[in-house]
């Protein structure tokens, strides 16, 4: 499954090589490959590469959201060209109930481009993922740029509206069965069973 982020969050074409994301689901989880321009802005987070870093969204980052649109349970994965990552599990819009989960993430960086490879175990995914969106952020202050695979349609923009990646209504249909066959069933997640018990 290949995706290119070709628009800003509000629907304008990006002015650079688009961020490319490939998802390869397998027996134990999903391999997520990223190829993206490297902007070097803002500077690297202070956290150790290879480790979770809270509020990574304030830096240069590529994000993927996997949503069950009936329950509004979703997985948010953030990957940074400096090696830090952030995995959040949410139940209800913006309602984080688990964060900074460990992640197998490798990246390599050139002068103007970076590539990343993250392994997302099935246990991180909410049951029955039905929708997907992906985002990229870079730049500082008034040069901050927010990009979306599925942006807010321009005719729906409100005056003064700010970028918000948790507008779940703009996510689009997504089905792992397209790659894994109609018979395939998403493995149950112990993590999400725990969340269900906590409610």
UniProtKB/Swiss-Prot annotation:
Source organism, top-level taxon: Eukaryota
Family: Belongs to the UPF0462 family.
Xref: PANTHER family: UPF0462 PROTEIN (PTHR31475), UPF0462 PROTEIN C4ORF33 (PTHR31475:SF3)
Name listed for the protein in its UniProt record: UPF0462 protein C4orf33
Lineage start: Eukaryota, Metazoa, Chordata, Craniata, Vertebrata
Gene name per UniProt: C4orf33
